[in-house]
Design a protein with these regions (language model features):
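Conserved catalytic-core segment of nucleotide-activated headgroup transferases in glycan assembly
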Residues: 164, 168-179, 320-403, 477, ...
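A nucleotide-sugar donor-handling region in carbohydrate enzymes
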Residues: 121-139, 268, 281-355, 361, ...
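Charge-rich, low-complexity intrinsically disordered regions
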Residues: 2-122
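Non-catalytic membrane-proximal stalk/linker segments that position and tether the catalytic domains
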Residues: 18-25, 110-152, 534-538
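Nucleotide-activated donor-binding/catalytic signature segment of Leloir-type glycosyltransferases, i.e.
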Residues: 394-418
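Active-site and donor-binding regions of nucleotide-sugar-utilizing enzymes
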Residues: 154-324
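A donor-sugar binding/catalytic signature common to diverse glycosyltransferases
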Residues: 418-462
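C-terminal amphipathic helix plus adjacent low-complexity
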Residues: 121-129, 480-538
Length: 538
């Protein structure tokens, strides 16, 4: 949340007596938080560059905007853990509570902390201390494997359409040395709405079509409101996290593995290509992974430069997420089809570098394209969070969202993606118009033309060197006329001046394609003492 969002929030508070009381409590607690040894001002500003750039007081930002958005005040305090341990309501600020009452009462700061009170001098282990514990954990799993026992792995999934490690899961499920399962976890960030249960059920239904019932571990909220410790209940050895963000209950976030016998691995959801990704790479959670798998030498070099561990826990295996694309040969059919893929960040993000979306600017044009180009088919595939965000009262609301969808689909050459894997749609499409982050590189795997939407040339500074190289192979659009020229000249007329250059460049980003998952599995297997060999057969 940036400074503008913070001011908007304060204005909304001022119009609501209850909100005004909450804002006053936040202002009152500012000094308490600012003086706390657990509030790390420099760390907070470094983790959230938009706050530093805005000049907003970091303690005030944490109280009014940061805590409601799930941000922590420092590397040694996890608000979600403290709130769960001590029964705090969602409205209570965890750090303010600890300094006003919890410290005196001996409240525990973390599940890692020994029972029996706060214990002055206790602190959260550093990433280096956490990494130093991995050899002992690895030795325990190696011993288990040497006895002929299967290595148990859990893949956390919050959205079936955002499951980058799925090819690695499938590779493990083909390998008799592993017992790999899925645990569908709640996304508690509130991006897609308040109640996580409907999204969990949709995710379960989608994955149940591809996996047997025993592959899906049961995850349900208890009558006390708590979520189960899936890793301990299953006896997991490995856990694959879907994100370096703390998107779910604390038992499903990377931090939960500290001090516990699990080996956490991570497969990137998006091919790292933006300035915002540097902020993610520098995060504490990335330093908690045993193995972080990267796509190519360029992204690994960025991680080594930015990460706390200077890349010591990372290696290049290729872009695991894109392996399945090779199973869908191009089959465009008799008519050319164009994908329309807008990003969700209509309100910005944790950093302005994530504010990629141009949808509100081009919504009318997108709705009219099927009528303007009847010789083309259009498939609308928005980011999964776009319409949940637009449904909020501050944007369109549900009725306007439904009306826009009906307007777009009123033409016979318009269709709406049902979500899930993008690979069949990528293979069956001839071009894309988009402003998404991950699709910038992923579409390159198809070799087909891309029209990338930018607000202005200053938007180019949101991209890291690799992202800028990708954009050089895209047809850039700064206005609606450029979008229509792309459809008319490149898609219909076939005058694609970037085709040869794009084909040569995409080979440099497609490392180990389509066997990146096999490379990741080989890395894990080697660390666990498995004999090297070819990928497991289906």
């Amino acid at each position: 949340m940036n400074a503008r969002d913070l001011l908007d929030k304060l204005r909304r508070y001022a119009a609501d007596p209850r909100g005004l009381a909450l804002a006053w409590r936040g202002l009152r607690d500012r000094g308490v938080v600012a003086r706390s040894p657990l509030f790390d001002r420099e760390w907070y500003l470094r983790e959230h560059p938009d706050v530093a750039a805005s000049g907003v007081d970091p303690a005030l930002h944490y109280l009014v905007a940061g805590h409601p958005a799930g941000l922590d005040p420092g590397p040694g305090f996890c608000g979600a853990e403290y709130a769960a341990l001590n029964g705090l309501p969602r409205s209570a600020n965890p750090l303010a509570h600890y300094e006003r009452r919890g410290r005196r009462r001996g409240c525990r700061l973390s599940f890692l902390q020994p029972e029996g009170g706060a214990g002055e001098g206790w602190r959260f282990p550093t990433p280096e201390e956490h990494q130093a514990a991995f050899p002992e954990k690895v030795a325990a799993v190696r011993a288990k494997a040497a006895r002929g026992e299967r290595v148990r792995a859990v893949f956390f999934v919050a959205d079936a359409a955002m499951f980058p490690a799925r090819p690695l899961l499938d590779a493990m499920r083909r390998d008799p040395r592993f017992d790999a399962r899925i645990a569908i976890i709640p996304d508690l960030r509130g991006i897609a709405g308040g109640d996580p249960l409907p999204a969990m059920e949709r995710c379960r239904a989608a994955l149940a079509e591809a996996y047997p019932p025993e592959a899906l571990l049961p995850v349900s909220r208890g009558s006390d409101g708590q979520w189960p410790d899936v890793l301990s209940d299953f006896g997991a050895d490995l856990v694959c996290h879907p994100s370096p963000y703390e998107l779910s209950d604390f038992k499903y976030n990377p931090r939960w593995c500290v001090g516990r016998p699990f080996l956490p691995v991570h497969v990137n959801y998006g091919y790292y290509r933006s300035v915002y990704d540097r902020h993610v790479m520098a995060s504490r959670n990335y330093a908690l992974f045993w193995k972080a798998f990267f796509e190519c030498d360029a992204t690994l070099a960025e991680y080594r430069e930015r990460s706390i561990l200077r890349g010591a826990n990372a290696e290049v295996v290729g872009y695991v997420k894109m392996d399945p694309l090779a199973s869908f040969p191009p089959n465009p059919g008799p008519r050319k089809r164009v994908m329309l893929c807008p990003h969700h960040s209509v309100e910005g993000g944790a950093n302005d570098a994530l504010a990629l979306s141009n949808f509100l600017r081009y919504a009318d044009l997108f709705a009219e394209l099927p009528a303007r180009f009847p010789e083309l088919d259009f498939l609308f595939r928005p980011h999964p969070f776009l319409f949940p965000v637009l449904s909020r009262p501050k944007f369109w609301g549900p009725a306007k969202c439904a009306a826009w969808r009906e307007r777009f689909l009123s033409r016979p050459n318009a269709s709406w993606s049902s979500g899930g894997d993008c690979f069949p749609e990528f293979a069956a499409s001839d071009a894309i118009v988009q402003d998404c982050g991950s699709y910038l590189v992923e579409w390159l795997y198809t070799g087909k033309p891309c029209c990338y939407l930018l607000k202005s040339e200053t938007d180019l500074e949101k991209f890291a060197p690799l992202g800028k190289e990708c954009l050089k192979r895209c047809h850039l659009a700064y206005d609606g006329a450029a979008i229509e020229r792309f459809l008319r000249d490149v898609v219909l007329a076939g005058r694609d001046a970037l085709a040869a250059e794009r084909e040569a460049f995409r080979r440099t980003v497609m490392v180990n394609h389509p066997h990146a998952a096999d490379a990741a599995l080989a890395s894990i297997g080697e660390a666990l003492g498995f004999a090297p060999g070819p990928p497991a057969s289906p």
